Amino acid sequence: MDTPARLNDLQRTTLAIVLAGGRGTRLGPLTNKRVKPAVHFGGKYRIIDFALSNCLNSGIRRIAVVTQYKAHSLLRHLQRGWSFLRGEMGEFIDLWPAQQRVEGAHWYRGTADAVFQNLDIIRSIRPKYVVVLAGDHIYKMDYTRMIADHAESGADCTVGCIEVPRMEAVAFGVMHVDANRRVTDFLEKPADPPCIPGRPDTALASMGIYVFSADYLYSLLEENISTIDTDHDFGKDILPRVVTQGTAIAHPFSMSCVSSDPNVEPYWRDVGTIDAYWAANLDLASTIPTLDLYDRNWPIWTYQEQLPPAKFVRDMKGLQGSGNNLIVCGGCVISGSQISRSVLSSNVKVSSFCNINEAVLLPQVTVGASCRLQKVVIDRGCAIPEGTVIGEDPVSDAERFYRTDDGVVLVTPEALRQKV
């Protein structure tokens, strides 16, 4: 039985490791300067804030963040916004950049190697359970429920899972489970994903969330590092090994998701493409968004820069603009323009006579007068020249910017020949 004392013990004996070193190549130019978990999301957040907030709200206050690729903006964000835990109480967010800590002098060669290279640090913390998390997904989850499920089952490893359309499962690890939720097979990013029996259009996908009994994890990593033919990856190497050698159980997301409406399907998004990133941002501007950011019982924490309030003013002719289904963050100034179904991040400035629809504007973007922007993502610091039109002519958009097959246009300072 999960009594408060029992849950508190699970929290105190758990170490969470957030993997935040991946580039996120499917996001194209958006990750040319920053690692994917550091990408801005929802106006005021970074993607990694969701995994870290889940840890904090779950009562897990011993956290490590593993970094490698272009980590400066991520490290700066963590140092400014996540340094409030009390070290004297045994709480911490440790930063583990690649340091060539083991023999061979190599950087992190995969997700499993990233954890292995810090094994001496992990052992010194002496956790009973280790939660390994991807730092690049958007969701709200009580990890303590998953840890309790792991402890009660007696499994060596517990894998968070969610049902997805079968053809979307090519981007995930896919598993088979028996009637007792035991994982019987695990395939990492299969070209032809197997379906859930009796449901030909649905697959059971890994969420990239694993709970390990600590001693078992140590032995797995030490075995893997001595293996020649390996990618040193949790999905490709570690999980298949657990399935054949030990006991892995599946933990459905529905068992531990956090939602203010139990009738709504559990929200989990891999915003790994420009289309998915754009759509997930715009969903937040809906009248009733799928992801509730206003749940005071499960806040999403972040670094909050001290900015003046957002301001809406009349245009240069004295006419009033309009806006609906908008997220507008601190420091924004909107001058008499028509804006709908969009996300305006911190310090965005929009001049007069603009028409903006279905746009995600990242921090410090300025939009000149008389611009028309449709179905766009504007990267941080871009200055959109007066009279610019984006999103109306697919050929012109593709010649100037990064345009997806679904028609979302990503505008970067480099594409505008600007230096930020």
Swiss-Prot record:
Binding site for alpha-D-glucose 1-phosphate: Y108, G173, E188, K189, S206
Keywords: ATP-binding, Carbohydrate metabolism, Glycogen biosynthesis, Glycogen metabolism, Nucleotide-binding, Nucleotidyltransferase, Transferase
Alphabetical list of InterPro entries matching this protein: ADP-Glc_PPase, ADP_Glu_pyroP_CS, GlgC_bac, GlmU/GlgC-like_hexapep, NTP_transferase_dom, Nucleotide-diphossugar_trans, Trimer_LpxA-like_sf
Listed EC numbers: 2.7.7.27
Pfam families tied to this protein: Hexapep_GlmU, NTP_transferase
Pathway: Glycan biosynthesis; glycogen biosynthesis
One Gene Ontology term of the molecular function aspect: ATP binding
Superkingdom per UniProt: Bacteria
Swiss-Prot/TrEMBL catalytic activity: alpha-D-glucose 1-phosphate + ATP + H(+) = ADP-alpha-D-glucose + diphosphate
One GO term (biological process): glycogen biosynthetic process
Family listed: Belongs to the bacterial/plant glucose-1-phosphate adenylyltransferase family.
Role: Involved in the biosynthesis of ADP-glucose, a building block required for the elongation reactions to produce glycogen. Catalyzes the reaction between ATP and alpha-D-glucose 1-phosphate (G1P) to produce pyrophosphate and ADP-Glc.
Subunit structure: Homotetramer.
Name this protein carries in UniProt: Glucose-1-phosphate adenylyltransferase
